[in-house]
């Protein structure tokens, strides 16, 4: 006689539970480890999530990516056999939470262990590992100090960066490398740029205060919030009163335009998406801005930002290094008075906002980026008017992309005169800005 056994139904986790958020965060973490950027990985993993669950999964995923080096090292000590990818990633997320517990106890340790086991038990393909998961996490809690000391000798575990990244920063900044790595592992502040065409800085600060949001003036039009909030809660955001932009990035537009920008001046914002610097240029002066972006999927963001701010630019699609192929018939041959060359780079200076960058980048990416930056610089220089200025900008802290590039450009372009500029800006723990680099050249 044959007995037909129906498969046990798969448990459904409440969307408000930590177990549910752990599943979604683990899915995103798996994608990051396969090479996908964290925002895209989260978008895929949380498509069907209600907003509170999406926010919880996002918080977990960002924590997990920031602690990926130490969590991987811990798991290698705690579990010898290879784990299923989903079991591994739920445990990595749980270990990140437990490591953060001392300084930021988002959940009790008991809750983390219990809900991690629930997340594993709720999936048919992983349920067999629930006992192992329970044992692994409880052992970590019992032996935390010993285990953390055991992995501390591994640079990737100690600093939560790839070894090549640590070596690069240490070589470039022998006296500051530890502070730089720590700063990159922190959470950056939420900084606003006030659109003074719509409202003064003092008025905006007062409106924020009335809405229960404390802020500090940290630049000519920069307000740093004491606590980050969703943008839709910002007074006047939909009406273009403010934009979210790091204080370091807010240096670009004033550097491009100078103290007395001429009305109608032709300005090229190369590599313009999502349009933050384009908007700032137009907020500051009545200039003609061409916003160029090579990735057509990012161009809608430029239009969205300009529409919200009530501003307009000539938006083009194309590679900054091939002006003849820009959309709209290519460059029209009329030289630009100012060019902002915010070139593709490693993004090593904004790692505290994008912690996945450290794990997605490879050491051999840097020479390729350096070559691309040089190609773009040379091409854009040919579109600059005599007497005009080009600002070279990156969001990197690696000297090969920054000062080395500025010195190279001075050597190969004898018609380039280097002018004063901020140079290298470094992030610091609790600092007001991310890592940026600015160099300025005038064409003679």
List the model feature ranges, each with a label.
Residues 1-444:
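S-adenosylmethionine
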């Amino acid at each position: 006689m044959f007995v037909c056994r129906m498969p046990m139904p798969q448990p459904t986790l409440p969307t408000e539970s930590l177990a549910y958020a752990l599943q979604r965060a683990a899915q995103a973490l798996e994608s990051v480890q396969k090479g996908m950027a964290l925002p895209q990985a989260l978008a895929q993993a949380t498509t069907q999530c209600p907003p509170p669950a999406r926010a919880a999964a996002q918080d977990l995923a960002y924590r997990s990516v920031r602690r990926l080096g130490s969590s991987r090292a811990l798991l290698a000590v705690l579990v010898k056999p290879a784990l299923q990818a989903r079991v591994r990633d739920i445990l990595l997320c749980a270990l990140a939470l437990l490591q953060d517990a001392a300084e930021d106890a988002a959940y009790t340790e008991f809750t983390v262990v219990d809900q991690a086991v629930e997340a594993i038990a709720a999936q048919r393909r992983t349920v067999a590992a629930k006992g192992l998961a329970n044992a692994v996490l409880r052992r970590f809690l019992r032996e935390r100090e010993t285990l953390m000391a055991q992995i501390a000798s591994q640079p990737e575990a100690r600093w939560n960066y790839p070894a090549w990244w640590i070596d690069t920063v240490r070589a470039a900044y022998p006296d500051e490398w530890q502070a730089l790595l720590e700063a990159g592992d922190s959470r950056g502040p939420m900084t606003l740029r006030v659109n003074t065409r719509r409202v003064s800085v003092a008025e905006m600060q007062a409106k924020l205060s009335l809405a229960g949001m404390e802020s500090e003036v940290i630049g000519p039009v920069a307000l740093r919030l004491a606590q980050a909030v969703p943008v839709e809660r910002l007074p006047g955001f939909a009406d273009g009163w403010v934009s979210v932009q790091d204080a370091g990035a807010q240096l670009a537009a004033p550097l491009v335009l100078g103290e007395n920008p001429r009305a109608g001046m032709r300005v090229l914002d190369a590599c313009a998406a999502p349009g933050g610097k384009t908007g700032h240029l137009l907020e500051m002066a009545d200039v003609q801005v061409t916003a160029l972006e090579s990735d057509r999927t990012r161009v809608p963001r430029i239009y969205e930002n300009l529409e919200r701010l009530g501003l307009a630019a000539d938006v083009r699609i194309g590679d900054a290094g091939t002006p003849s192929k820009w959309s709209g018939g290519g460059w029209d041959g009329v030289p630009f008075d100012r060019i902002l060359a915010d070139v593709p780079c490693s993004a090593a200076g904004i790692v505290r906002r994008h912690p996945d960058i450290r794990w997605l980048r490879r050491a051999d990416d840097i020479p390729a980026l350096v070559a691309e930056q040089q190609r773009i610089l040379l091409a854009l220089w040919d579109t600059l008017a005599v007497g005009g200025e080009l600002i070279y900008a990156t969001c990197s802290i690696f000297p090969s992309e920054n000062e080395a590039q500025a010195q190279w450009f001075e050597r190969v372009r004898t018609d380039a005169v280097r002018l004063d500029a901020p140079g290298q800006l470094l992030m610091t723990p609790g600092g007001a800005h991310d890592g940026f680099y600015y160099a300025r050249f005038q064409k003679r």
